[in-house]
Amino acid sequence: KQISALLLQHINLTFLSVVAAVIIGVPIGILISHFKKANKTVLGIANTIQAIPSMALLGFLIPFLGIGVVPSVFMVVLYSLLPIIKNTFTSIEGINPQMIEAAEGIGLTKLQILFKIQIPMALPIIMAGIRISAVTAVGLMTIAAFVGAGGLGFLVFSGIRTANTNQILAGAIPACILALFIDWTAAIIEKIVVPKGISGNIGKNKVTFLQKLVLLVCFALFTFGIGKTIFERYIATPEKTVTVASKDYTEQIILGNMLAELIENNTDIKVNRKFALGGTKVIFG
């Protein structure tokens, strides 16, 4: 039951991060392909962010974004941008200039050239970048447990702390399977969005009913998870809540649970448990 709940958290956090990275990264890649002077600066910034250790970046974000979901998603989005921006820029730059010239010759506007020629031709390489980002995001999101955002990383960190190999595997194996599943899902989406003439596999480019059903279920789960989060945070009647947090020490986790039980049993206050956090800075964040 715990693994299922943490897996669902991990899926929602990962999908949210990847969708946000695509919404941000693809337009940036398109823009820098048209504004040549900006491409070195933008790619340089993206490369620099990629070089920063993930734990250090997450720790840096805590004073500004607090703990929980927001800094975790923000961090993964930043790390996911480089493959998307770079692949988008490279794919558009790689289009034959004679094709663009021919499009201009028949009277197409710049926007028409972008949406009818450049983006369709660039889609295979753009989707390759998105698939890389999606798989990377699954691994990076395990660090979300460090700041109390949940996910499969909770099992991994708990297992490391208690030298429990089975618990580590209980978090690591579902994460690996999830990464493969997300890559497979992205491959199906690629079949759908890439024009058949460009993909080069006209006969093999058909999406089966089962694949469509899996995509529909994934979309429904993602929409439900995001909708539930938005409803609980912004729409539902707010309850009296207090957060009880602890470091990743056994004694502190026991004390944290004792305090949480004491508060809930003697008051009408709901306790938000954030145990086994990464350190003092995280707790006071």
Question: What are the functions of these language-model segments?
Answer:
Residues 28-61, 76, 84-90, 94:
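Cytoplasmic-entry segments and transmembrane alpha-helices of multi-pass inner-membrane transporters
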Residues 1-17:
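Periplasmic/extracellular loop-to-transmembrane helix junction in inner-membrane transport proteins
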Residues 78, 111-143, 166, 170, ...:
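Transmembrane alpha-helices
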Residues 272-284:
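Short helix-initiation/N-cap motifs at beta->coil->alpha
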Residues 36, 93, 170-232, 236:
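C-terminal transmembrane helix and the adjacent membrane-cytosol boundary/short C-terminal tail
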